[in-house]
Every structure is written in structure tokens, then in C-alpha cells.
Curated annotation (Swiss-Prot):
The record marks N168 as: Not N-glycosylated. Belongs to the CALHM family. Residues 214-251 are annotated as: Intersubunit interaction. PANTHER family: CALCIUM HOMEOSTASIS MODULATOR PROTEIN, CALCIUM HOMEOSTASIS MODULATOR PROTEIN 2. The chain crosses the membrane at residues 22-43, 53-76, 102-132, 180-206. Residues 14-39 are annotated as: Central pore. This is Calcium homeostasis modulator protein 2. It catalyses: ATP(in) = ATP(out). Residues 1-21, 77-101, 207-323 are cytoplasmic.
Length: 323
């Protein structure tokens, strides 16, 4: 049963890794929407106190968005490829334009969840109403022929998000809530429009600057997906067999289940890869060509003998497009 569950999780992992990034971004957005709804129901409680409302409302919108953004940056493999590139090669082979595009890719993917959080927060309007209710101009409020009483206006307005305040001012409370929710939702829709325009322009710029045809770009994407899946699967088997060999040398035997016995028999491991080889296949990769032939990854480049003491130096390759 445990093996079946593990196999199902492995299948789901490979399934999502093999799909287009837009599907993944959509799932991230849906998860963020659910989290925001849960937060609004369970954790959001406006203090309804002057000065505190503003800090609490902005914190409720900004801090979760910042946390989601940092998590997105941390979970993006390109982030650590860029770190490795700076550590091992000082990014000497990356020109300004590809580096900018790569950073844009990292930040763009990391921004999906925080932008979704901010948009949903603004469309709901609760945090915005909480933050700005005390700053509404009392002289602009009217309920019939009556104006808002100027005495203690800030304290009264700060209590409106909680439905509190003098009973004779309930009409003003509804007007304040309606006005601030209008502003909040307006900003939310504007944010959606700005993000949509930026995504459209980024896609256009990417395809306009790409020297590759659509079919070759699709092939390159398929190659990267397949290489990553095969590499991860092979690395798991290699590490398991190597661990079994080392345990056998220490104890004189190793307790293996049937699947592990088949792996050890079918895939004998004699040694490990030296650190320079790992460094050679790790880091930022740009589409490059060598003598007119494409090199689709650092592993592909290493396999062709074009790194380290290989037959061709890095500078004969042409950096064309970021991944």
C-alpha cells in the first residue's frame, strides 16, 4: 500500500513537472485564492482602533504577499542555478540582456502567488476598508440632509469596519464601507489589467527576440523536461545503489527488498562523479550553438566534451536566448 501511494505521488510529481508552466501558475493562483479566503474567515480581525487599523490592514495585504514572493523565489530552480553561476563562473558568460530576462523569469514566476493574494484582498475590500476608514474626510459624508458630526470623527470612523459606532450614524457607516470598497475593487481590477498587459508584452518580447522557430522552441522545452526527469530518476537510482554498495562494504551484507535487489543487479555503480563534473552541469544555461549545432543544456554541452578541458572553449558558443 505504501509503495502504491509513493508511486502515485511520484506520478503526480512527474505529471505536473511535464506540463506547461501556465498550468502550474494557475494551480498556484487557485491555491492562493483558497488560502486568502481561509485567512479572511479565520484570521482577519480588524482592531477598529485609530492608528492600528492602518498598520493592520496594510500588513494583512503586504506581509503574506511578501512571504509568498520569497517562497516563490526559493522554490524556483532558476534561482539556485543563478547562484551557482555567480559562485562558480562569476556570471562571466551572461550578457546584460539574458541576465535581465532570466531575473525577469524568476521574479515573474515568484510574483504569481503574491499578485493573486493582493488582487483577491483588494477585490474583497475588507483589509482596505479596515486600513483607510479612519482617513475618510468627515465633511464629505452625508446621510440625507445631515452631515457627519466632527467631534471624535477619527475614533468613530475607525470603529466602522467592525460594525460599531453610534446607532444614529449607521447610514454613514454604510456610505464609508461602500466608498472604500469601490476604491479597493477599482485598484484590484487595475492591478489585474496592468499584470495582463505586462504578461502580454513580456511574451511578445520573448518571442520577438528569440532566433528559434516555434517548433524548435517546443522541442527545446520537451528536451529540458525529459532531461530533467531522466536525470532525477537516474540520480535517485544511482544514489540508492551507491548507498547499498557502501553499506555492504561496511557490514559485509545489505538488507535489500526485491526492488532494490533488481536495481543493484541491473545497474552496477563503480564510482561517483567528481565535483568539477557536477559544477560543469550546474548553473544558468543559455541557448548556445557550437559550429552551427544546438546545445540544449549544460549536460548536453558536457556530453559533447565542450567544458573544462574540452575541445572547444566557451567563447566560441553563441548565447542567444535564456531558458
Amino acid at each position: 500500500m505504501a509503495a502504491l501511494i509513493a508511486e502515485n505521488f511520484r506520478f503526480l510529481s512527474l505529471f505536473f513537472k511535464s506540463k506547461d508552466v501556465m498550468i502550474f501558475n494557475g494551480l498556484v493562483a487557485l491555491g492562493t485564492v483558497g488560502s486568502q479566503e481561509l485567512f479572511s474567515v479565520v484570521a482577519f480581525h480588524c482592531p477598529c482602533s485609530p492608528a492600528r487599523n492602518y498598520l493592520y490592514g496594510l500588513t494583512a495585504i503586504g506581509v503574506p504577499a511578501l512571504a509568498l514572493f520569497l517562497i516563490g523565489v526559493i522554490l524556483n530552480n532558476h534561482t539556485w542555478n543563478l547562484v551557482a553561476e555567480c559562485q562558480y563562473r562569476r556570471a562571466k558568460n551572461c550578457s546584460a540582456a539574458p541576465t535581465f530576462l532570466l531575473l525577469s523569469s524568476i521574479l515573474g514566476r515568484a510574483a504569481v502567488a503574491p499578485v493573486t493574494w493582493s488582487v483577491i484582498s483588494l477585490l474583497r475590500g475588507e483589509a482596505y476598508v479596515c486600513a483607510l476608514s479612519e482617513f475618510v474626510d468627515p465633511s464629505s459624508l452625508t446621510a440625507g440632509d445631515e452631515g457627519f458630526p466632527p467631534d471624535h470623527a477619527t475614533e468613530i470612523l475607525a470603529r466602522f469596519p467592525c460594525g460599531e459606532g453610534p446607532a444614529n450614524l449607521s447610514g454613514f457607516r454604510e456610505e464609508v464601507s461602500r466608498r472604500l470598497k469601490y476604491e479597493s475593487q477599482l485598484f484590484g481590477w487595475l492591478l489585474i489589467g496592468v499584470v495582463a498587459i505586462l504578461v502580454f508584452l513580456t511574451k511578445c518580447f520573448k518571442h520577438y527576440c528569440s532566433p528559434l522557430s516555434y517548433r524548435q522552441e517546443a522541442y527545446w522545452a520537451q528536451y529540458r523536461t525529459n532531461e530533467d526527469q531522466l536525470f532525477q530518476r537516474t540520480a535517485e537510482v544511482h544514489s540508492r545503489v551507491l548507498a547499498a554498495n557502501n553499506v555492504r562494504r561496511f557490514f559485509g551484507f545489505v538488507a535489500l527488498n526485491k526492488d532494490d535487489e533488481e536495481l543493484v543487479t541491473k545497474f552496477p555503480v563503480e564510482g561517483t562523479q567528481p565535483r568539477p563534473q557536477w559544477n560543469a552541469i550546474t548553473g544558468v544555461y543559455l541557448y548556445r550553438e557550437n559550429q552551427g549545432l544546438p546545445l540544449y543544456s549544460r549536460l548536453h554541452k558536457w556530453a559533447q566534451g565542450l567544458t573544462g578541458n574540452g575541445t572547444a572553449p566557451d567563447n566560441v558558443e553563441m548565447a542567444l536566448l535564456t531558458v
